[in-house]
Amino acid sequence: MTEYKLVIVGGGGVGKSALTIQLIQNHFIDEYDPTIEDSYRKQVTIDEETCLLDILDTAGQEEYSAMRDQYMRTGQGFLCVYSITSRSSFDEIASFREQILRVKDKDRVPMIVVGNKCDLESDRQVTTGEGQDLAKSFGSPFLETSAKIRVNVEEAFYSLVREIRKDLKGDSKPEKGKKKRPLKACTLL
């Protein structure tokens, strides 16, 4: 059975733990208890393939940022989560992505941009279009989710697994700075 190492990143209070617990335990946690680092495992079937999701729920608070490099090194794919009710959490996503790319020394890493708390439409500070544009600029899928009313929760994690699978199939591509040289044929006369 294939195991996928998923890492969920984003600012404090955007709902990373709520999304993860909704996926794993099918319930919504409404009290805010800042995470330092939690790990969850769940066996699921995605596109008729049974696999094991190893999900690392990370700290959003800046005081734990020193821990980020380590989990970014080991993760295969990343859910970059912001809250649609927080402009600042949206603005942080680009720096999370840059840090991931730097740590992994790659131009592209399997990633999905997630706008959480879509049930709080009246408090929206970030439009759906802004989220779509950001994800498009990254070459990543985009979803709006709600851990509270369970909108697109499974789809967010499953889409990330599909991105990892695509990446693994194309893994023979050269990494940043390492270009494959074309084969040259010589003709002797």
Curated annotation (Swiss-Prot):
Propeptide cleavage-removed residue intervals: 187-189
Enzyme Commission number(s) of this protein: 3.6.5.2
Membrane topology reported for the UniProt record: Lipid-anchor
Top EC class of this enzyme: hydrolase
Keywords: Cell membrane, GTP-binding, Hydrolase, Lipoprotein, Membrane, Methylation, Nucleotide-binding, Prenylation
Residues reported to bind GTP: 10-17, 57-61, 116-119
Motif Effector region, residue numbers: 32-40
GO molecular function, one term: G protein activity
Top-level taxon of the source organism: Eukaryota
PTM annotation (Cysteine methyl ester): residues: 186
Catalytic reaction(s) noted: GTP + H2O = GDP + phosphate + H(+)
Pfam family membership, one: Ras
Main location: membrane
Stretches the record annotates as Disordered: 169-189
Subcellular location: Cell membrane
Annotated lipid attachment (S-geranylgeranyl cysteine): 186
GO CC annotation terms, alphabetical: cell cortex; cell leading edge; cytoplasmic side of plasma membrane; lipid droplet; macropinosome; pathogen-containing vacuole; phagocytic cup; phagocytic vesicle
Keyword Hydrolase among record annotations: yes
Keyword check for Hydrolase: yes
Modulation of this protein's activity: Alternates between an inactive form bound to GDP and an active form bound to GTP. Activated by a guanine nucleotide-exchange factor (GEF) and inactivated by a GTPase-activating protein (GAP).
Family membership noted in the UniProt record: Belongs to the small GTPase superfamily. Ras family.
NCBIfam families hit by this protein: small_GTP
Assembly: Interacts with ripA.
Protein task: Ras proteins bind GDP/GTP and possess intrinsic GTPase activity.
UniProt name for this protein: Ras-like protein rasG
Species per Swiss-Prot/TrEMBL record: Dictyostelium discoideum
Upper classification of the organism: Eukaryota, Amoebozoa, Evosea, Eumycetozoa, Dictyostelia
